[in-house]
Amino acid sequence: MSKITRRDFINHAGMYTAGGIALSASSLGFRTNQAHAQPMPDWLSLTDEAALEPDLPIIDPHHHLWDRPGNRYMLEDLLLDTSAHNVRQTVFVECTSMYRADGPEELKVVGETEFVQGVAAKSASGGYGETRVATGIVGSADLRLGDRVAAVLEAQIAASPQRFRGIRHRAAWADLSVTPNRAADAPNHILLDPDFRKGYAHLRTHGLTFEAWLYHTHIADLTELANAFPDTTIIFNHLGGPIGIGNYAGRRDEVFAAWKPAVAELAKCPNVVAKVGGIQMVVNGYGWHEMDKPPTSDQLLQTNQDWYHYIIEQFGPERCMFESNFPVDKLSCSYTVLWNQFKKLTVGYS
């Protein structure tokens, strides 16, 4: 593994995602019951850690914002979570938040970008502290529109010319034991769909990247897409979503064994970079949210380090970035604990 300091590694996300530093990406988002569940502050407070290396600058390339009945995660909530660490900038990733109520169906997604642009402007005023939230914005577009998606991409860019960086169109399909709500699922093998690929071709034309959210069973589809479009940057979300529930419950070693060669093959594509994190979700099967108290950073590291080390070895530190995936991963641990884990992981890198 190449040498890299914790400062370089933890602040590395800016090369691909933070507006004003470089670029980012996106895809239509992950929808499970977890994405709509409300984290429990009293439970999270049962595990209290001081932030390690609190002055180390961080760019968080993956979080969401929403205001849903009984489930609110807005600017003030994010800033409270990030306050213990030195989070300098963040990147918002689409989550079907604040879509337009009216107008053409394909353009309703632009409402989300308009909403986040407003949040980013509030943050940029300096009136909410030094953290600059949503310096990069990753939005949605239905790439299955083919050539017609160009108008959607142009509208998204127009809604936030300085911050809009890419598109996320979800490719997370799994069997019914994992995602029983098939209406919320992506079509199976969508990355191979000709109409999707016709729309995907417009990302490069518009200077946008693609953020890929899928499960480990479909990583090969992403590798094929990356090879077919070598000039489009892909950002690989959540380690490829290793599944640990439903028919995959109790099969972690088997999943890991299948995941490793798929990741190794994907890493051969120089146009793909990886987000390291996003595996504290319910779908990953660790059951943290069912414990009497949340995990410590040591517990997280002990459980996750084999996955983290392998993906970093395959992609190299220069093509990896740590992500929080908050508030989705907040069901399992606090922001402070999560980033303490990442800092402990990288101690040997400097």
Language model features with spans:
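Active-site gating/metal-coordination segments in enzymes
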Residues: P39-W43, P104-H218, E224-N227, G240, ...
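N-terminal export signals
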Residues: D8-F30
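Conserved, mostly hydrophobic/aromatic
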Residues: H62, T90, I137, L203, ...
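Short amphipathic alpha-helices and their capping/turn segments at secondary-structure boundaries
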Residues: L46-E53, M74-A84, D147-R163, A220-P230, ...
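Short, well-ordered coil/turn segments that N-cap beta-strands
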Residues: P54-P57, N86-Q89, E130-G136, P161-R165, ...
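H/E-rich (His + Asp/Glu) clusters that bind or coordinate divalent metals
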Residues: Q38-L44, I243-S350
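An N-terminally biased module of ancient metal coordination in phosphate/nucleic-acid-related enzymes
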Residues: F9-I10, A37-G129
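N-terminal secretory signal peptides
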Residues: M1-D8
